[in-house]
């Protein structure tokens, strides 16, 4: 197994191990910058109307996303961060890796736990 403390791939992002977010429409994503829909085993987008947070967290999609980062890949849904970094800006990925660096451990790789949950529930009155 990769020793994440000793060797963090250059493209690594901690968020898939510690974070979930939802949009006001209920779409579940690893972060607000992720620009494609996460999908379930039936290729249906994860949505709070049909799925639990645990469904997304434990999904093959999320496991594959985590593995892509460990393999040094640059996942397609993260193009906003890659674009910011290519233009010399400090991306959300870089800021959050620094912010949450104390969570980057080998145990985190084996037992990912939600540490940051951002639920955007919208502002439509339901009375």
Say what each PLM segment does.
Residues 17-26, 107-127:
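N-terminal pre-triad scaffold of radical SAM enzymes
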Residues 7, 102-103, 123:
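Histidine (H) residue identity feature
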Residues 2-99, 118:
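Accessory C-terminal segments flanking Radical SAM cores
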Residues 100-108:
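A Trp-anchored, charged/polar loop motif used as the substrate-binding/catalytic surface
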């Amino acid at each position: 197994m990769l020793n994440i403390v000793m060797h963090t791939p250059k493209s690594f992002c901690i968020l898939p191990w510690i974070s979930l977010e939802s949009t006001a429409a209920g779409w579940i994503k690893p972060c607000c910058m992720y620009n494609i829909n996460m999908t379930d085993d039936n290729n249906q987008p994860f949505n709070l109307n049909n799925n639990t947070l645990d469904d997304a967290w434990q999904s093959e999609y999320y496991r594959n996303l985590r593995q892509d980062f460990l393999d040094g890949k640059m996942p397609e849904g993260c193009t906003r961060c890659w674009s910011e970094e290519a233009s010399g800006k400090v991306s959300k990925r870089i800021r959050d890796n620094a912010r949450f660096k104390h969570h980057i451990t080998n145990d985190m790789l084996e037992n990912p736990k939600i540490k940051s949950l951002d639920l955007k529930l919208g502002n439509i009155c339901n009375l």
